[in-house]
Amino acid sequence: MTTQIELKILDARIGTEYPLPAYATPGSAGMDLRALLDAPLTLAPGDTTLVPTGLAIHIQDPGLCATILPRSGLGHKHGIVLGNLVGLIDSDYQGQLMVSVWNRGNDNFTMQPGERIAQLVIMPVVQASFQLVDEFNQSERGEGGFGSSGRQ
């Protein structure tokens, strides 16, 4: 399935120095977002900062949203994750995509201009309405929570 989403380039380096976001393979779910910095940025352990991507999107379709997710290599190798864990972009948002970056590692990390820092995934949305009830129909699991389904 392919859906058209409006994209606004806010930084002239996109499309010249850095490519537009694109799927790396036919099976890719996410497109890489880059740090559109003017100079290298060093994050000390525990630091968080908002990093511009130089892009704005307008999804328009209320049946879709976008999520900003971490890149696995940055988190595993360097302790660089998203400060808000997951970024949710609503269909009616039109501003610049910013990435909250958190250095949860033990060493300084220097981010370079144009470095791939996160990925953008477009996802379907279901807007639910609630039906108030006094009791639920009994399920096999019931109220069992954290760890109740076992480890094996």
Swiss-Prot record:
Pathway: Pyrimidine metabolism; dUMP biosynthesis; dUMP from dCTP (dUTP route): step 2/2
Xref: SUPFAM superfamilies: dUTPase-like
Name of a matching Pfam family: dUTPase
CDD domains: trimeric_dUTPase
Enzyme Commission (EC) number: 3.6.1.23
Keywords assigned: Hydrolase, Magnesium, Metal-binding, Nucleotide metabolism
Function, as annotated: This enzyme is involved in nucleotide metabolism: it produces dUMP, the immediate precursor of thymidine nucleotides and it decreases the intracellular concentration of dUTP so that uracil cannot be incorporated into DNA.
Name of this protein: Deoxyuridine 5'-triphosphate nucleotidohydrolase
